[in-house]
Amino acid sequence: LDRSSAASDVYKRQVLDIPRLRTDTSVAPEATFDPVKIYGREAYQVVEIGSGLGEAIVHRAAEMPEANFLAVEVYTPGIADLLLKMGNAGVENVRVAQANAPELLDNMLEENSVDELWVFFPDPWHKSRHHKRRLVSPAFADKVARVLKPGGIWRLATDWEEYALVMREVLEAHPDFENVNPGAGATEEDPLGGWAPRWEGRTLTSFERKAQEAGRRAHDLTYRRK
C-alpha cells in the first residue's frame, strides 16, 4: 500500500492535471501552464512532443537539472515507462502532459514561453492517404512558432528520408523560422542541404537503434525562431 500511495504521489506531482474538452487527451481552452506552480520556479523551458518511452527527455533532464522539461505524450504505456525512468534516474525537473500536441500548443502554453521544442521520430504515416495525419505540417509549424520565444530552437529528427525532406520543406517555407545549419550536408542530389549534425543532447534511444539495425539513419534538422 505504501508503495502504491508513494507512486500515486509521484504521479500527482509529475503528471499535469489538464482540463479536458471531449476526450481524455484533449486540452480545454481554459488550460494554463504556470511554471512556478508546476515546477516551483521559472527556468529554461524544454518541451518534447511525442516523448515515447521517455529515453531522450529523461537523459537530457538529468544532464540539465537547472532547466524545466515538459514531456507531451498521448499513449499511457509510454507515460508509464517515462515515469519509471524518471524515478530510476531521480530527475525532479520533468513534468508530463498526456495530451494531443496541437491542442496543448494552442490552449495551454503561452505565447513566447518555450526556449526549446523537440519532435524526435514522429510517426511517419507511410501510406500517402495518411500523410495528412503527419505531425509536422505548415499549420503545426504555426503553433510551434507561437509558443517559441524569439531565438528559441526547434529540433527535429526522423529516420525516414522522405519525411525528413517534407519537414525541411515545411520549415524552409515558414516565415518565422531560419535554418541553424543552412547548406550543411548538401550533395549533388540534394543541393539545398541544411541538415543538422547529430545533436549531442539527443541520446541514442532503443527506437533509433532499431532503425539503424534496419539500415535507416537519422536525419536531424534545427531551426531558430526569428
What are these model-predicted stretches?
Residues 1-7, 11, 160:
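Single conserved hydrophobic/aromatic residue that forms the stacking wall/gate
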Residues 48:
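Class I SAM-dependent methyltransferase core
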Residues 54-55:
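Glycine-rich SAM-binding Motif I of class I
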Residues 75:
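Conserved SAM/SAH-binding beta-strand->alpha-helix loop
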Residues 83-111:
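S-adenosyl-L-methionine
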Residues 136-150:
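A short glycine-rich, Lys/Arg-flanked "PGG" loop and its adjoining helix->strand segment in the class I
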Residues 150-158:
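Conserved beta-strand signature within the Rossmann-like core of class I S-adenosyl-L-methionine
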Residues 169, 173-226:
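Class I S-adenosyl-L-methionine
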